[in-house]
Design a protein with these regions (language model features):
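Domain-level detector of nuclease and nuclease-like folds
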Residues: 144-263
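Generic structural signal of hydrophobic/aromatic residues within well-ordered alpha-helices
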Residues: 75-79, 113-117, 248-251
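A general structural signal for short secondary-structure junctions and capping/turn motifs
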Residues: 83, 106-108, 141, 186-190
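N-terminal Lys/Arg-rich, disordered targeting/topogenic segments
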Residues: 1-18
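N-terminal module-boundary/linker segments of secreted carbohydrate-active enzymes
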Residues: 37-39, 44-110, 242-244, 257-263
Length: 263
């Protein structure tokens, strides 16, 4: 039994229908621009709903301006009290000027590197026969990246976790330490207040940078990092450059709950 299929006739859209579509598309685009955050003025305030707004100081201001307009916490006051000066360059920095690496300055039988590993890591395992001194394994949430990380002692693995001088030795040399005697410099290089177990690649990225040129990629650690630098500079009576102080002030001003570490 045969049948026939009726073909629909295609109708060319009228000029009016094309015009209506163009107008509708334009209106939708205009609404998106007006109300979606990042596209336009965000008239609905969607970008600020559900999250507190963080207001950072104006980086165009001086350190003194930033600090004077901030909540007067211990950290803010300590940054404000740091003396300003220029880098000293009478003689170049050398690591040997700060004594042997990781000396046992506290005479507890363990070198400073292993002392810091034991302090900063958890689930620590030590090598038998070393009086619980030589750390062979540990784990921690690494502060500079915020990631979980393990330490395993070995020729190819030990360097993945390094001990950082929060205030770099060369920075200290240029801001006052060049005037110290050898014993004071060795004490500074092994001061636990200025030492952190950190990700090796982050430490290499930092090198001898100050706060004006380097901060950890983990923004959640910025407050504690600057607080540590401030406490170290204060304890050892080191000065800061103008740029360094402004960077430290900008961070400190945004950290009303950050205490100043005890030395």
């Amino acid at each position: 039994m045969g049948y026939s299929r009726r073909r629909r006739r295609w109708r060319k859209p009228s000029k009016g229908s094309w015009g209506n579509r163009i107008i509708a598309t334009f209106i939708l685009a205009l609404l998106a621009w007006a109300f979606i955050p990042g596209l336009g003025p965000d008239l609905a305030g969607l970008s600020t709903k559900g999250a507190p707004k963080l207001t950072l100081p104006d980086w165009g201001k001086s350190a003194d301006q930033i600090l004077s307009e901030s909540v007067q916490t211990d950290l803010v006051k300590a940054v404000a009290a740091l003396p300003e000066g220029k880098w000293e360059s009478a003689s170049p920095y050398q690591r040997s000027q700060f004594g042997i690496r990781w000396a046992d300055v506290d005479r507890n039988g363990c070198d400073t590197r292993n002392d810091i590993l034991k302090r900063d890591l958890s689930q620590v395992h030590t090598k038998p026969g070393t009086r619980d001194c030589v750390v062979v394994f540990g784990e921690f949430t690494e502060p500079y990246t915020g990631r979980y990380q393990q330490f395993r002692k070995g020729a190819q693995t030990s360097s993945k976790v390094q001990i950082d001088h929060v205030v770099a030795l060369s920075n200290a040399w240029k801001t006052g330490a060049s005037r110290w005697d050898a014993k004071a410099r060795e004490q500074f290089a092994n001061d636990p207040l200025n030492l952190l177990a950190v990700d090796g690649s982050s430490n290499q990225d930092k090198q001898d940078s100050d706060a004006a040129s380097w901060l950890p990629s983990n923004k959640g650690f910025h407050c504690q990092y600057v607080a540590l630098q401030t406490a170290v500079k204060q304890k050892w009576q080191l000065w800061v450059t103008k740029e360094e102080k402004r960077a430290m002030a900008a961070v400190a001003a945004s950290c009303p709950a950050q205490p100043l570490p005890a030395g």
